[in-house]
C-alpha cells in the first residue's frame, strides 16, 4: 500500500491533476467528503487528508510514504528526515517581510510578527539583527497597524491584501512552491514503485510548463 499525505485547499486542487497523470484518482471528492483516508482508482494507493503543517510529520514518521508540502512548511517545520525529489511548481508564492508603506526602519530591536517563527529566527540571525518574534496564526497584516510589530513575515501571492491594509512587501526570504516529499525508509522498501511515480509526476510537471 502506498499512502500519500495531502492537505485540502490550493495544494490539493493543484496536485490531483498531476496524480491523475499517474492514474491515481480519488474515488470520491476529498473537498466534499468527511473521510480523512480516501481510496483511489488504484487499489494499492490511498490519500491521507491532513493539515498542511502536519504533512512533513506524517511522512517523516512513516504514517505516509509520500506527501505534498509547501516549501514554506518544510522550512518552518523541518524536512530533514525526508527526501525532497521534486518541485511540483504548483501553489507558487513568495515568503517575504512586509511593513507599513513609508515607515522608517526602526532602530534597535525589531519586532516581527509571523507564524514562521523558525524561519524568522534564522533569517535575522544570518543578518546579525536582534529581533523579538511575536507568533501569530492569522491576520498578520493587523500587527504593524496597531503597533504590535514593526514588520511581518508572511506568504505573499498577489500582495493585494498587504496593499489594502497600507503595507508593502519588502525583503524576499524565499520563493515558495509545493514539493513532493518521500519517507526515506519507504524509498528503500518500495523504490521501484515510488521512483516510477516520481518520474511520471516529473514528466507531467515538465509537460505542463512546456505547454
UniProtKB/Swiss-Prot annotation:
Pathway: Amino-acid biosynthesis; L-histidine biosynthesis; L-histidine from 5-phospho-alpha-D-ribose 1-diphosphate: step 1/9. Its EC number is 2.4.2.17. Keywords: Amino-acid biosynthesis, ATP-binding, Cytoplasm, Glycosyltransferase, Histidine biosynthesis, Nucleotide-binding, Transferase. GO terms for biological process: L-histidine biosynthetic process. It holds the Pfam family HisG. GO terms for cellular component: cytoplasm. It comes from the Bacteria. Transmembrane segments: none annotated. GO terms for molecular function: ATP binding; ATP phosphoribosyltransferase activity. The keyword Flavoprotein does not apply. It catalyses: 1-(5-phospho-beta-D-ribosyl)-ATP + diphosphate = 5-phospho-alpha-D-ribose 1-diphosphate + ATP. It is found in: Cytoplasm. Belongs to the ATP phosphoribosyltransferase family. Short subfamily. Lacks the C-terminal regulatory region which is replaced by HisZ. HAMAP family: HisG_Short. Catalyzes the condensation of ATP and 5-phosphoribose 1-diphosphate to form N'-(5'-phosphoribosyl)-ATP (PR-ATP). Has a crucial role in the pathway because the rate of histidine biosynthesis seems to be controlled primarily by regulation of HisG enzymatic activity. This is ATP phosphoribosyltransferase. It comes from Pseudomonas putida (strain ATCC 47054 / DSM 6125 / CFBP 8728 / NCIMB 11950 / KT2440). The gene is hisG.
Amino acid at each position: 500500500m502506498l499512502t500519500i499525505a495531502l492537505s485540502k485547499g490550493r495544494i490539493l486542487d493543484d496536485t490531483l491533476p498531476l496524480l491523475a497523470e499517474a492514474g491515481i484518482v480519488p474515488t470520491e471528492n476529498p473537498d466534499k467528503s468527511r473521510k480523512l483516508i480516501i481510496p483511489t482508482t488504484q487499489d494499492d494507493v490511498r490519500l491521507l487528508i491532513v493539515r498542511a503543517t502536519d504533512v512533513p510529520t506524517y511522512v517523516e514518521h512513516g504514517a505516509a510514504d509520500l506527501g505534498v508540502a509547501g516549501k514554506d512548511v518544510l522550512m518552518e517545520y523541518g524536512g530533514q528526515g525526508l527526501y525532497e525529489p521534486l518541485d511540483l511548481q504548483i501553489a507558487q508564492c513568495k515568503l517575504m517581510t512586509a511593513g507599513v508603506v513609508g515607515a522608517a526602519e526602526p532602530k534597535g530591536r525589531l519586532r516581527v510578527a509571523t507564524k514562521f517563527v523558525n524561519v524568522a529566527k534564522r533569517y535575522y540571525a544570518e543578518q546579525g539583527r536582534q529581533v523579538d518574534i511575536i507568533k501569530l496564526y492569522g491576520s498578520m497584516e493587523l500587527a504593524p497597524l496597531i503597533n504590535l510589530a514593526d514588520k511581518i513575515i508572511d506568504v505573499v501571492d498577489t500582495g493585494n491584501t498587504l496593499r489594502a491594509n497600507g503595507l508593502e512587501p519588502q525583503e524576499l526570504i524565499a520563493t515558495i512552491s509545493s514539493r513532493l516529499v518521500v519517507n526515506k525508509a519507504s524509498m528503500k522498501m518500495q523504490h521501484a514503485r515510488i521512483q516510477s511515480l516520481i518520474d511520471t509526476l516529473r514528466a507531467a510537471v515538465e509537460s505542463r510548463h512546456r505547454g
